[in-house]
């Protein structure tokens, strides 16, 4: 109302329209709308048509007094380290390169890097020579900064509406980085990752570009996870399993294919471990319940409620690892099975200490405490699966 400077404003229309459902009056020929703003603070809207007169009188509200319920700035005391790692609690940044790094979420790279290590170990053909070390580092760059960075950037792009509800101060919804800049980053990271995959195939002497196919398949999976029309993340089960497979199976397969040969038993074992990855992915869903519910995304905390979802989460993580330990025991590898069980126990302790108490408040603390034992368990399984 503060934009109306004249005492009386009158609007006439020239064609027939309708009245919409949100209170906007559309006019037809010979209709008129008169808006009167008085010094008393009251305003009058008069709508007239042949045979009808509609009057609305209301008190004026100063728009400066109406404030959004959602903060449009990052919480005070945000950390610059959190900003660079791409995790919550980040400070707001104006430097474009720091913002670009934030979008790639470097905190998510280590599991992919570790997956390459596990695959190389499972191949049984990795040697501590300069060439093998260089190949493994290049494979880690492909899996971590390039393709995980691509995945995280494209996910943030398609999550911009949810982030506008949950965290409107994040780089994309806040406008700190423009649409063309985001799209450019997506393409640079994707093409960079696929290019490195092709180089690795040539370096390894592959007649079939296995690493390239894995990188291409993983990139496609990342896209349909985040983007419509499929948008796998809309379904808590399918989306989180796809995420788990991306973080555990794909980098393992890439590392093993680079130094050896993928075998059916390893494929099955890593896909089984991806169910644990599903549980890990659910941990991140609790902080987005409000936005997911508003936009109709059926994450497991939305579909089942927080209490049920947190037990599904820990069940997926623990039962999967115990099943793998049972598989190793049945395969005649009792010491590896025992080592894996020893690594599961502290995870259960931290689940009860942090996650099951409050999955929103303690999600970061739980992951920092428990996940090192999970990734060590994956490495133990890789050593047990050496070919």
UniProtKB/Swiss-Prot annotation:
Broad class of the protein's primary localization: plastid
Signal peptide: none
Pfam families given in the database record: UbiA
GO cellular component: chloroplast; chloroplast membrane; chloroplast thylakoid; cytosol
Stretches for region Disordered: 62-81
Pathway the protein takes part in: Porphyrin-containing compound metabolism; chlorophyll biosynthesis
Transit peptide: 1-57
Enzyme class: transferase
Keywords from the UniProt entry: Chlorophyll biosynthesis, Chloroplast, Membrane, Plastid, Transferase, Transit peptide, Transmembrane, Transmembrane helix
Membrane topology term: Multi-pass membrane protein
Keyword Transferase: yes
Protein name: Chlorophyll synthase, chloroplastic
Lineage, highest ranks first: Eukaryota, Viridiplantae, Streptophyta, Embryophyta, Tracheophyta
């Amino acid at each position: 109302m503060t934009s109306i400077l004249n005492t009386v404003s009158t609007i006439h229309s020239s064609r027939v329209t309708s009245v919409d459902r949100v209170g906007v009056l559309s006019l037809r020929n010979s209709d008129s709308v008169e808006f009167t703003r008085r010094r008393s603070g009251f305003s009058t809207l008069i709508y007239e048509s042949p045979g009808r007169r509609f009057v609305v009188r209301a008190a004026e509200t100063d728009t400066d007094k109406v404030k959004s319920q959602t903060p449009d700035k990052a919480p005070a005391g945000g950390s610059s380290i959190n900003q660079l790692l791409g995790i919550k609690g980040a400070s707001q940044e104006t430097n474009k390169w720091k913002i670009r790094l934030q979008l790639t979420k470097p905190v998510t790279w280590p599991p992919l890097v570790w997956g390459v290590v596990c695959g190389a170990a499972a191949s049984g053909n990795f040697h501590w020579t300069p060439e093998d070390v260089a190949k493994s580092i290049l494979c880690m760059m492909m899996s971590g900064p390039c393709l995980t960075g691509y995945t995280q950037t494209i996910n943030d792009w398609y999550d911009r509406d949810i982030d506008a509800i949950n965290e409107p101060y994040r780089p994309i919804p806040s406008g700190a980085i423009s649409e063309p800049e985001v799209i450019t980053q997506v393409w640079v990271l994707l093409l960079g990752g696929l290019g490195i995959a092709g180089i690795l195939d040539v370096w390894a002497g592959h007649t079939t570009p296995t690493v390239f196919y894995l990188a291409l398949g993983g990139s496609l999976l990342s896209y349909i996870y985040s983007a419509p029309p499929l948008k796998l993340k809309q379904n808590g089960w399918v989306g989180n399993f796809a995420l788990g497979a991306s973080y555990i199976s794909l980098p393992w397969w890439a590392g093993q294919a680079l130094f050896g040969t993928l075998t059916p038993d390893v494929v099955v074992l890593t896909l089984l471990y991806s169910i644990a990855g599903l549980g890990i992915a659910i941990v991140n869903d609790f902080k987005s319940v409000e936005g997911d519910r508003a936009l109709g995304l059926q994450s497991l905390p939305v579909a089942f409620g927080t209490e049920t979802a947190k037990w599904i989460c820990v069940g997926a993580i623990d039962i999967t690892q115990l099943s793998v330990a049972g598989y190793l025991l049945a395969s005649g590898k009792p010491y590896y099975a025992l080592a894996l069980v020893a690594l599961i126990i502290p995870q259960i302790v931290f689940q009860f200490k942090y996650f099951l108490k409050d999955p929103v408040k303690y999600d970061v603390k739980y992951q920092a405490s428990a996940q090192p034992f999970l990734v060590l368990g994956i490495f133990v399984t890789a050593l047990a699966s050496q070919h």
